[in-house]
């Protein structure tokens, strides 16, 4: 039995312990825990205060309503296409501006959807150097689009980089050369982008299923499945891979310059009349070598002629295979794709043009001419389609002077492309001009930045042999038209 004094001592200790627990902060309560799972040492009020934006009163949204608060730390929700982030989940725009395929142009860091530029760079994508060492001429040259227009007439050039005109603040004009104008996608009546039924990319609307039109303004009265069924050709391809299906009807890619149907036609674009054109018969409006009729891409030959394209006379002592082989020579195409083969003999086209000659029409002196018609730059002579340059000149068209009065530094500054690479890494620099690699015949352009393989082909020939490839686009010779210079618009040859 304990004395009364001991009992009083126990009562005093119990009272003090009760008071202490009552006054203890809620951080010791098991309801709040830290990220490690240990009890949180913050009160609930303090934890929530740390998860609110500065200046927000108690009871307002925690973590901007984009996450949960755990012991004063915001755990942000995962969203599409990325995640909310930031100390208070305040950042949603996680993608920063890009320039030439690089985030913040490679000259800054992406912070909460905005570029923080390195010293010496500015702009929404850190694409503009604050100090420019380029001359105005070089700067403007670097700002020209493929049509040689500075910033597509939709912006201004700053040190070789385009700054697009977006005074309205909507940013609808963009692109490396300000070539994209999304204002073209806005419906004039509703003022909605693509009528609210599609997405805009570089000034073109891509409509949702069931809608069509330049601005997705027309609704299709049949289901997408039925539309696709009507457009499917017998070989199971939508519009035979030669057109676009719009509400159950095929719009074939080929357009005849006269306004009638073009070489590609049919309900599902299944007919390609180009299959009736022999590579050595491109210079006439007649199909099937002029000796038959073309029916949906197949030749029906007249009497006395045979072959896939009615190219072989029946009275020829040679077989069709022997005739074609004699006309090919070292080329993969009969008459090098520049003439007509009949019974093993080539007739070069166009008739009367002395620039195309040879037993198999292998020589084409038009290749020695520049776009202005000057032969070998005026500094050489043409021999079977190749320039033989005068002393002191070199290059494919004798366009480069061997003697140079520039310093190496001056020369290099003129050869650097927009990203600072010398001749795009595909050539060497001589006197301020890029000499593109001879091993890669398809590399061209002022800065060796063009790939001539991108030019359209027909019959296996770049620009159909009726023009030259200039930075990915065909520049057709007189009388020819079309993306691949495959359409003859001149007078018929006899």
Swiss-Prot record:
Residue numbers spanned by region Cysteine-rich tandem repeats: 51-494
Repeat region (VII), residues: 327-367
Positions annotated as VI repeat: 276-326
Compartment(s) where it occurs, according to its Swiss-Prot or TrEMBL record: Secreted
II repeat locations: 96-142
Main location: secreted
Source superkingdom: Eukaryota
Glycosylation sites: 405
Covalent S-S links between cysteines: 40-71, 51-69, 63-74, 76-89, 91-112, 96-110, 104-115, 117-126, 132-159, 143-157, 151-162, 164-178, 180-202, 185-200, 194-205, 207-216, 220-247, 231-245, 239-250, 252-269, 271-296, 276-294, 288-299, 301-310, 316-343, 327-341, 335-346, 348-361, 363-384, 368-382, 376-387, 389-398, 404-431, 415-429, 423-434, 436-448, 450-471, 455-469, 463-474, 476-485
Per-repeat ranges for I: 51-95
Gene Ontology cellular-component annotations: extracellular region; plasma membrane
Pfam families membership: EGF_2, EGF_integrin
Signal sequence region: 1-23
Domain I-EGF positions: 40-90, 91-127, 132-179, 180-217, 220-270, 271-311, 316-362, 363-399, 404-449, 450-486
PANTHER family xrefs: INTEGRIN BETA SUBUNIT, INTEGRIN BETA-PS
UniProt note: domains: Contains ten tandem EGF-like repeats strikingly similar to those found in the cysteine rich 'stalk-like' structure of integrin beta-subunits.
Record protein name field: Integrin beta-like protein 1
């Amino acid at each position: 039995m304990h004395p009364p004094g001991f009992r009083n001592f126990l009562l005093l200790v119990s009272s003090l312990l009760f008071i202490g627990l009552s006054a203890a902060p809620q951080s010791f309560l098991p309801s709040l825990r830290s990220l490690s799972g240990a009890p949180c040492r913050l009160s609930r009020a303090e934890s929530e205060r740390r998860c609110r934006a500065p200046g927000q009163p108690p009871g307002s949204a925690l973590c901007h309503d984009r996450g949960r608060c755990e012991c004063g730390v915001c755990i942000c929700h995962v969203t599409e296409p990325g995640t909310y982030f930031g100390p208070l989940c305040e950042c949603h725009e996680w993608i920063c501006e890009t320039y030439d395929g690089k985030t913040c142009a490679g000259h800054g860091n992406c912070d909460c959807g905005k570029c923080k530029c390195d010293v010496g760079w500015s702009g929404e994508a850190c694409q503009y150097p604050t100090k420019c060492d380029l001359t105005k001429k070089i700067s403007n040259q670097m700002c020209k689009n493929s049509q040689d227009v500075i910033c597509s007439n939709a912006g201004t050039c700053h040190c070789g980089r385009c700054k697009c005109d977006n005074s309205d603040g909507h940013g609808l004009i963009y692109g490396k050369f300000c070539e994209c104008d999304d204002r073209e996608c806005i419906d004039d009546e509703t003022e909605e982008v693509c009528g609210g039924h599609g997405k805009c990319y570089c000034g073109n609307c891509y409509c949702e299923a069931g809608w069509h039109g330049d601005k997705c303004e027309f609704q299709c009265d049949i289901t997408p499945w039925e539309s696709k069924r009507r457009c499917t050709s017998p070989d199971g391809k939508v519009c035979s891979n030669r057109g676009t299906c719009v509400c159950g009807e095929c719009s074939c890619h080929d357009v005849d310059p006269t306004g009638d149907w073009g070489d590609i036609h049919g309900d599902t674009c299944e007919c390609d009349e180009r299959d009736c054109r022999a590579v050595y018969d491109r210079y006439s409006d007649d199909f099937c070598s002029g000796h038959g009729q073309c029916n949906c891409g197949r030749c029906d030959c007249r009497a006395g002629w045979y072959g896939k394209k009615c190219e072989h006379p029946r009275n020829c002592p040679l077989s069709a295979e022997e005739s074609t082989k004699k006309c090919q020579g070292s080329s993969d195409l009969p008459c090098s794709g520049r003439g007509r083969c009949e019974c093993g003999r080539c007739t070069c086209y166009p008739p009367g043009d002395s620039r195309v000659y040879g037993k198999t029409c292998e020589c084409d002196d038009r290749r020695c001419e520049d776009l202005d018609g000057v032969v070998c730059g005026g500094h050489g002579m043409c021999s079977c389609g190749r320039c033989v340059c005068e002393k002191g000149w070199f290059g494919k068209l004798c366009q480069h002077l061997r003697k140079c009065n520039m310093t190496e530094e001056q020369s290099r500054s003129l050869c650097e492309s927009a990203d600072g690479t010398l001749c795009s890494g595909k050539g060497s620099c001589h006197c301020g001009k890029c000499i593109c690699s001879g091993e890669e015949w398809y590399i061209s352009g002022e800065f060796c930045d063009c790939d001539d393989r991108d030019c359209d082909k027909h019959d296996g020939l770049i620009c159909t042999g009726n023009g030259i490839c200039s930075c990915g686009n065909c520049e057709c010779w007189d009388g020819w038209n079309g993306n691949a210079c495959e359409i003859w618009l001149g007078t018929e040859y006899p």
